[in-house]
Swiss-Prot record:
BP GO annotations: pectin catabolic process
InterPro entries the record matches: Pectate_lyase_2
Name of the molecule in the record: Periplasmic pectate lyase
Range of residues in the leader sequence: 1-23
Upper classification of the organism: Bacteria, Pseudomonadati, Pseudomonadota, Gammaproteobacteria, Enterobacterales
Species this chain originates from: Yersinia pseudotuberculosis serotype I (strain IP32953)
Enzyme class: lyase
Endoplasmic reticulum is among the record's keywords: no
Amino acid sequence: MKKRALLLSMSVLAMLYIPAGQAAEIDRLTVVKQYVDNVLNKASDTYHGDKPSPLLADGVDPRTGQQMEWIFPDGRRAVLSNFSAQQNLMRVMSGLSELSGDPQYQKRAEDIVRYHFQNYQDNSGLLYWGGHRFVDLKTLQPEGPSEKEKVHELKNAYPYYDLMFSVDSDATTRFIRGFWNAHVYDWRILETSRHGEYGKPMGALWESTFEQQPPFFATKGLSFLNAGNDLIYSASLLYKYQQDQGALVWAKRLADQYVLPRDAKTGLGVYQFTQALKREEPTDDADTHSKFGDRAQRQFGPEFGPTALEGNMMLKGRTSTLYSENALMQLQLGKDLGGQGDDLLKWTVDGLKAFAKYGYNEQDNTFRPMIANGQDLSNYTLPRDGYYGKKGSVLKPYKAGNEFLISYARAYAVDNDPLLWKVARGIASDQGLGDIGSAPGKEMKVKLDTTNSDPYALFALLDLYNASQVAEYRSLAEKVADNIIKTRYIDGFFMASPDRQYADVDAIEPYALLALEASLRNKPQAVAPFLNGAGFTEGAYLMADGSARISTRDNELFLLNVGETLQPNGRK
């Protein structure tokens, strides 16, 4: 009897194994469940005998189970476990329990959160995670690249605070308060920085005085939006869960700092609301340290005048932060906060409209590289070395991708402006999704045989469906989902190519599949909204030749194919 049961169990497991290229034959929820089971099997702590921690490695080789390591310049190795880079996975695990009825995934996610609060929260409230801190899964000790001074940093990470508050609201509150306390250097002028100091004593926080400064005032701290986004998001969630009015005031105040300097004519910008304080004279254009002043002014100022500032540079990468990551986050906060979020909605939608009006070229579905005043930099040759490239480099228009399709589709649900729809329509067509119509459901011809396998496209199509209830958009999303499973579900993990050495446990493909399944089951609230957030690890990394590779990012490790090694990046 036992033998028969064992054989039956093995046959069931065999049925659940889905070879690449055949995965569409099985339902999506089973695929996501199998994926998460594989993560828990291969990325878990196997180093501590019968008392393992609940923590997970960030990356794993699906073929061998080898967990991805960080190699420090002195040769030390650490199995990378950066909780800030696992927040999409936490949302997947929670959503999977909601849809499947199996509580084990939610429980594991809760255990991971609880373990971090119990073991990796310092006395200031900060967690050992982010751009320059992580846990070595082998030793369970906090690690970090020494040349980065082991500072705290979150940039577009958007932690799953809903889960964190449900596990330990007091510890989550301590973190958010500590986060702001460490990253606001001067509350009077709201000088912020992406780097925060661990162990900093708590200051006056929300009780601090504030004096509004003129646009682009000079500070030592760099007010990058990708760092500001996480501050805005965290304080807004503190208000949502704890009704902390001071947190809301400062969250909206910080968000407003990125709105006030927008160009008066175009409404574009800004990526920073300050400019770097010049503390030394540069001797080399190629040395782009912020102590020499605003990097855009140094490189573009002689030709374009005082408006050429870092905050005003509407270039590839910066615009993704502005009009995708920031937009998605603030659109969601606008919903979550009710009437208190109306300002955030207006600021966000107005910004997307401005970018559509001045930046979008529907003829070839590209965005123009620009200065916020509308100065088109398309095909501009850089006259000198600098922060934005070497002398002789040419700035080119860049494709409007699915990350923008999501934000424009979601914004259309808030404001049915044809300008927003025009951008969404152009991107969808260029991405091989067909014609989504002159308006929702009108004159459309979606491509139900599309080969698109981009999870961003799937999320965007669900947003189009949610905004319009036009069934064809969700049918198209199902086709994209099938393509994702056929082309990206490899050896039980999601990877862009079967040649990749490591799979990222924070992959968004299962997140997108789960969101679709929730929609089809009429349970959209079962899966957390997608905000396009992601954590990262950055620091010096030991090369095969014994040299130290400066400013190495974990995503570069995830891009390596089997047998490849990191190549020099030329950074000093």
